[in-house]
C-alpha cells in the first residue's frame, strides 16, 4: 500500500523536486534554454491533459493519459540533452525517486501498473493536474 497524500503534499513534493532540478541546472550556468524547454514540456502536458477526448472508455482514457505522461518525460529529457550531462542524470534520478514514493493515484502508479485496477484512479488526475500547476507556479517564481 502506498501513502495517501492530499493534493497539497503532492504539490509540495513536485515543487521541491523541480526546484532541486532548477537549482542544479542554474549552478551549471550553461543551460539558459533548458528553462524554456522544460516549461514548454510542462505546458504541453497540461494542454494535452486538459484537451484529451471525452467519452472514451476507461482503458482508452488511461492509455491516452499515459501517452501524454511518457511524452512529457521524453520532452524533458530532450530539453535537458543540450545542457550539462548531469542535468539529464538528475532528471532521471528525480523521476526514479518520484516513482519510489509510491503515492496512491500518481501517474507513475496509473501508467506503470498494468494490473487493470487503474480505472479507479482516474479521479486522482484532477489532483495531479493541480499539483503540476502548483509546481509550475513555484518553478516560475525562481
Swiss-Prot record:
Which organism is this protein's natural source? Rattus norvegicus
**Job of this protein:** Promotes neurite outgrowth and especially branching of neuritic processes in primary hippocampal and cortical cells.
Report a single Gene Ontology molecular function.
Answer: identical protein binding
Q: Which UniProt keywords apply?
A: Cell membrane, Glycoprotein, GPI-anchor, Lipoprotein, Membrane, Signal, Synapse
Kindly list the residue ranges recorded as spanning the membrane.
Answer: none
Name where it's found.
Answer: Cell membrane; Synapse
Signal peptide interval: 1-27
Q: Which family does it belong to?
A: Belongs to the neuritin family.
Q: How does it sit in the membrane?
A: Lipid-anchor; GPI-anchor
Main subcellular location: membrane
The protein's superkingdom reads Eukaryota
Q: Which GO terms describe its cellular component?
A: AMPA glutamate receptor complex; extracellular space; glutamatergic synapse; plasma membrane; postsynaptic endocytic zone; presynapse; side of membrane
Name of the protein this chain belongs to: Neuritin
Enumerate the propeptide ranges. 117-142
Annotated GO biological processes are:
nervous system development; neuron projection extension; presynaptic modulation of chemical synaptic transmission; regulation of synapse maturation
**Tissue distribution:** Expressed predominantly in brain (at protein level). Highest expression in the dentate gyrus and lowest expression in the striatum. Concentrated on neuronal cell bodies and unevenly dispersed along neuritic projections in the nonmyelinated regions of the brain. Expressed in postmitotic-differentiating neurons of the developmental nervous system and neuronal structures associated with plasticity in the adult.
**Lipidation positions, renumbered (GPI-anchor amidated glycine):** 116
Q: Detail the disulphide connectivity of this chain as listed in its UniProt entry.
A: none
Amino acid at each position: 500500500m502506498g501513502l495517501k497524500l492530499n493534493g497539497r503534499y503532492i504539490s509540495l513534493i513536485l515543487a521541491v523536486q523541480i526546484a532541486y532540478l532548477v537549482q542544479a541546472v542554474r549552478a551549471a550556468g550553461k543551460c539558459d534554454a533548458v528553462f524554456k524547454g522544460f516549461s514548454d514540456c510542462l505546458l504541453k502536458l497540461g494542454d494535452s491533459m486538459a484537451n484529451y477526448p471525452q467519452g472514451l472508455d476507461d482503458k482508452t482514457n488511461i492509455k491516452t493519459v499515459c501517452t501524454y505522461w511518457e511524452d512529457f518525460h521524453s520532452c524533458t529529457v530532450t530539453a535537458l540533452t543540450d545542457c550539462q550531462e548531469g542535468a539529464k542524470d538528475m532528471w532521471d534520478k528525480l523521476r526514479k525517486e518520484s516513482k519510489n514514493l509510491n503515492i496512491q493515484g500518481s501517474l507513475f502508479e496509473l501508467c506503470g501498473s498494468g494490473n487493470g485496477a487503474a480505472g479507479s484512479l482516474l479521479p486522482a488526475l484532477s489532483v495531479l493536474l493541480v499539483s503540476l500547476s502548483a509546481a509550475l507556479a513555484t518553478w516560475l517564481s525562481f
